Amino acid sequence: IAPAVRVAVGDHYGLTKGKSVMGKIVNALHRMGFDEVYDTSFSADLTIMEESAEFLDRIKKGKKLPLLTSCCPAWVKFITDQYKEYIPNLSTCRSPQGMLSAVIKEYFRDPEHAGGKKTVMISIMPCTAKKAEAVRPNSFTDGEQDTDIVITTTELLRMIDNFGLDFATLDPEA
């Protein structure tokens, strides 16, 4: 779940601005059948660490600068379509969605962690461009798609309503 999704969901249901609704979202997702729920804030930190290392490496080795982020698939498409000369400036790092999906899929490849279940990684993002990111060639590990499904904030809200959940009254879960 992306941070912007949390804010939009709380706003949609008229909840107090600035108050975290992540626990309520976790509850709703569990009621809809999700086993585990992860926040992309963790993987955003991983992305920043990787981009920092890449930036330092570029400085030390005199490689192409400035370093442009690759976190937003719409931005990457814009650069690759309109400004091809800046493609070498794009970071090679995955987005937080891509990082989290790869980490979770790798962890649950181990049968001890998977508990006999197949891991399906569903990403909840504010932007439809994340759907295209999930099927890019660099979003696969060993031939397997890392992010299986991407749903938008609007789609999540529709799911909550279709399940008949009264979001405002849900108790927070961890």
Residue ranges of each PLM-predicted region?
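Iron-sulfur-associated redox domains of electron-transfer enzymes in respiratory
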Residues: 1-174
